[in-house]
Amino acid sequence: MVTESAVSSKSSQLVTKDSITLTINGRRFKFSVGDGTGDVSPAETLTETLRKRLQMTGSKESCGVGACGCCAVIVNGDAVAACMTLTVELDGKNITTLEGLEDATKGLDPIQQAFIDEYAFQCGYCTPGIIMVAKALFMKKAQPTPDEIKEALAGNFCRCISHYTVLRALNKLAGNMNAELSTIVRANDLVEDPIPIAQELYPSPYASGHVCKRSLD
């Protein structure tokens, strides 16, 4: 586990600037660096800066060690774990968060719309991170293959088990209409030890068609 002290030790070796400038969703933000009131601490993570300073709460924090993907944002075209990225390391970088995807004139990003169309979420906590990782992939390749989509999302975990509909939404968006869903994800892939539950994916009556495992009784 990466502790605050470990991050602080790393950051103290990196920071030599009195201020940093970040471009977030097309807007420039300048912060002073230090330990004073209002300063960005050398140990402050991007998740903390986004959520606490800028009230951009799309990036979620769950594991805090870069293992779940909930906090993902895009930095200079690449998906990164915001909870493991020090804000002071991002001077001069371009950052895109979930809040920056929707276009004022065109509406939702195609990936966001695909998730809505396919009900590719349940509680929604992990959804922003999944969308941002998918966005980074689609920015690099407009029509990724099913395997490329799975590989890109390997670090994203959904505790509600909505992986099936996530993959379906992204494969449809990528034009992989002929991809067999059974080759994209199998029910047994979703849990290590599927105890007495139906070995089939059913629409959840509680989540407007979101996909989940459901007991036969």
Could you say what each language-model-derived stretch is?
Residues 1-217:
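Signature of N-terminal electron-transfer/Fe-S-associated modules in redox systems
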